[in-house]
């Protein structure tokens, strides 16, 4: 092991610490309520506003997820809802309202829904009735569980198969979530209209964008607000008519131009585009890997868009790595690599146009989500910006391992291009397959 390479135990501790820092390792206000969900039933609260989570089951001490959400909405200030290991919360109450009585779980006040314990991860199954969560107002933090079975294709309700973040929402943090098997016209898993939404260490896979509208899209994510996606993977989602996994749509209601910042993240093997940014939207990509998508890796469409990228790989996508509007504003001269010379990277010492990065398929290598890492002979190794932080490399990679690592042992440690920094903490560096 080279001196700069972390031990397996140290890496695991760093990941736990990073997750804690990303989430909520701070004391709650004294007035906060804490509810522990102990029932898988989908039953509302019997006396909303009394400060007690007590479902309408006639049994003392029964707290359902729906009842806990209703009590948290009625309780002033920030409240916590703790989920129980191994429980599956299947939503069964059909109907649409904003009170969390039926359909999705509506968040109207500051609330955290959490699972940070050991054991089998809880699952919130929307059961095809509607999405799982809708954040109307207040701040919301969702941590540590799976979101499945969401459907947003009802009349007047087409956005966010698993989660919808509305324009009036406050700070929204989504961390350590797995969102899979959800469907919507706009944002198969996540739809964001919010101005302060962050996705950290999440995995989106097998979500679908339906085709009921001509501008449907975003099989995993549709953004019309301000969204940061970091240390996350977006894999194997299916967009209709090639509209792809992540869509950034301009002209959000009552706000400025939408922005998506993609950092230390992997977007791979999606049906359609990896990322589609339309009109006056801004896409910022840092230390990311966008590869193996069925049509185009990144498309900047329409007029007035902005595309900024550094230390990132766009490669081996089905049709082209990039399709970029002639009117787009570009800032791409920052140690980037594409495999087919379509991303308008200036040829020179700080970019690598037309170079195959030689990556693995998305697999788990010890982090939360599947990632595509460099093969041992990959040209991305030690080729990113020589500076750490500021205008240079991110200080950690997608799996929260430190950068840089002197993988080749030549005494000169420098960051790798893309989401993953190759180190010796991998049993098999070069699997039989490649991306």
Task: Give the positions of each predicted feature.
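N-terminal secretory signal peptides that target proteins for export/translocation
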Residues: 1-14
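Sec-dependent signal peptide recognition
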Residues: 14-22
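N-terminal signal peptide c-region/cleavage motif recognized by signal peptidases
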Residues: 27-30
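N-terminal, post-signal-peptide segments of secreted/periplasmic proteins
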Residues: 32-159, 165-170, 304-426
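Acidic Asp/Glu-based divalent-cation binding sites
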Residues: 78-81, 88, 188, 219, ...
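Right-handed parallel beta-helix
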Residues: 139-240
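Predominantly extracellular beta-rich ligand-binding scaffolds that present long acidic/polar faces
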Residues: 173, 192-204, 216-217, 221-372
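Short acidic, low-complexity intrinsically disordered linear motifs used
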Residues: 425-435
């Amino acid at each position: 092991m080279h001196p700069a390479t972390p031990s397996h135990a140290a890496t695991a501790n760093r990941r736990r610490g990073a997750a804690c820092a990303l989430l909520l390792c701070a004391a709650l206000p004294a007035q906060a309520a804490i509810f522990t969900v102990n029932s898988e039933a989908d039953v509302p609260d019997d006396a909303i506003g009394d400060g007690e989570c007590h479902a309408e089951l006639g049994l003392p001490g029964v707290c359902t997820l729906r009842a806990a959400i209703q009590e948290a909405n009625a309780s002033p200030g920030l409240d916590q809802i703790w989920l129980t290991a191994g429980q599956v919360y299947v939503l069964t109450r059909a109907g649409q309202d904003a009170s969390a009585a039926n359909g999705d779980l509506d968040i109207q006040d500051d609330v955290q829904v959490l699972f940070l314990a050991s054991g089998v991860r809880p699952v919130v199954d929307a059961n095809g009735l509607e999405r799982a969560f809708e954040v109307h107002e207040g701040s919301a933090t969702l941590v540590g569980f799976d979101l499945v079975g969401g459907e947003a294709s009802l009349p007047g309700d087409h956005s966010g198969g698993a989660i919808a973040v509305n324009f009036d929402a406050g700070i929204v943090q989504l961390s350590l979530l797995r969102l899979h098997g959800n469907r919507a016209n706009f944002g198969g898993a996540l739809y964001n209209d919010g101005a302060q939404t962050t996705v950290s260490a999440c995995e989106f896979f097998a979500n679908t964008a339906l085709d009921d509208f001509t501008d449907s899209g975003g099989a995993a994510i549709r953004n019309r607000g301000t969204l940061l996606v970091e240390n996350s993977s977006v894999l194997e989602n299916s967009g209709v008519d090639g509209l792809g996994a992540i869509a950034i749509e301009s002209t959000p209601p009552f706000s400025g131009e939408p922005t998506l910042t993609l950092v230390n993240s992997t977007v791979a093997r999606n049906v359609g585009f990896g990322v589609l940014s339309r009109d006056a939207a801004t896409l910022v990509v840092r230390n990311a890997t966008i590869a193996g998508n069925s049509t185009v890796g990144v498309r900047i469409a329409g007029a007035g868009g902005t595309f900024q990228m550094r230390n990132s790989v766009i490669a081996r996508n089905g049709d082209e790595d990039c399709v970029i509007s002639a009117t787009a504003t570009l800032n791409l001269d920052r140690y980037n690599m594409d495999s087919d010379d379509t991303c308008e990277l200036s040829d020179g010492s700080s970019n690598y146009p037309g170079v195959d990065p030689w990556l693995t398929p998305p697999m788990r290598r010890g982090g939360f989500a599947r990632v595509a890492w460099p093969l041992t002979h990959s040209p991305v190794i030690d080729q990113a910006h020589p500076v750490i932080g500021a205008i240079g490399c991110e200080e950690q990679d997608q799996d929260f391992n430190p950068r840089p690592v002197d993988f080749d042992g030549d005494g000169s440690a420098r960051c790798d291009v893309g989401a993953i920094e190759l180190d010796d903490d991998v049993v098999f560096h070069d699997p039989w397959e490649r991306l």
